[in-house]
């Protein structure tokens, strides 16, 4: 959730980091929420096109993000990452090493609204209509610990 990313960004800004939020046009509302909650963070969401994103990410000391294209792209261009993954996606797509990449996993397996078992969607269960986060149980403190640990080991 954007509020959690804002909380991490606030702590990193207090540590002296510079925080840049990126994403496509659909990410602008969340980026705006992050920047509003973390004074000093800057949003380029909806501004940086995909061809320009790879070189930008390669310059980052660290990229924090959900299990998303930009987080995977950051890892591909050599940037250290901390990713927030839902358990089903972590099994298939999370990085395995821990020195340059860390993974925070949400173990939520059922929709918090209707209870549909998300591990069976596409197999025995239809997708529910609720647009809710499945990573809300990932704690800000553990993400921040991983961010600081990766930064310390890669600088």
Task: List where the protein language model places each region.
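Donor-binding and catalytic core of enzymes assembling or modifying cell-surface/extracellular glycoconjugates
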Residues: 2-88
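Nucleotide-sugar donor-binding patch of glycosyltransferase catalytic domains
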Residues: 35, 43-44, 75-154
């Amino acid at each position: 959730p954007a509020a959690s990313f804002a909380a991490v960004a606030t702590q990193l800004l207090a540590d002296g980091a510079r925080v840049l939020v990126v994403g496509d046009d659909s990410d602008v509302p969340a980026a705006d929420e992050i920047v509003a909650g973390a004074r000093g963070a800057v949003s380029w969401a909806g501004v940086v096109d995909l061809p320009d994103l790879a070189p930008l990410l390669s310059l980052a000391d660290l990229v924090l993000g959900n299990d998303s294209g930009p987080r995977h792209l950051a890892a591909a261009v050599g940037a250290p990452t901390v990713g927030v993954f839902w358990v089903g996606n972590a099994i298939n797509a999370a990085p395995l090493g821990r020195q340059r990449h860390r993974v925070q996993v949400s173990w939520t397996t059922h929709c918090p609204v209707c209870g549909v078992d998300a591990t069976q969607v596409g197999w025995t269960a239809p997708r529910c209509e609720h647009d809710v986060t499945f990573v809300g149980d990932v704690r800000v403190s553990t993400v921040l610990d991983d961010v600081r640990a990766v930064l310390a080991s890669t600088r």
